[in-house]
């Protein structure tokens, strides 16, 4: 996605020649239909933000895709390679779907070869005090496993995303995740309310 768009759009090598007040500090930064209250730097290479609100409390890295984020006042810091997708579900719900840029979404949850947010899923569970017993449904394949929580609160959504990505000791995030209805990546694709 990012490399293809860069190949099509990056025709000017010297960004200073682009007569625009907000020259991109890196040609591989793409912001589509979004509101951003942060400043970008050359370190934000390979960044795609679409249909999202990225507030002043956000810190982004590189190699990231950020999509569907509702208006928020979160304090969130994402390391390189961590992506966020928020999917509207039902009339008022949001499903939090973080992932690693290179995750392939396949493999059993208890396999050390199944990657999630750029680390083995077994390590992700261990960091958060979870086991496969905490999943209600399929655990034989990450694509079909109910990993992604539903919430109707934007504030809770931010807590869930922080817990699922960079703050595994966040007790509130763990409690929210354990008590939420969860969907698999397959279910999200089938049930998303894209008209919202």
Please provide the spans of the model-predicted regions.
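Left-handed beta-helix
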Residues: 1-196
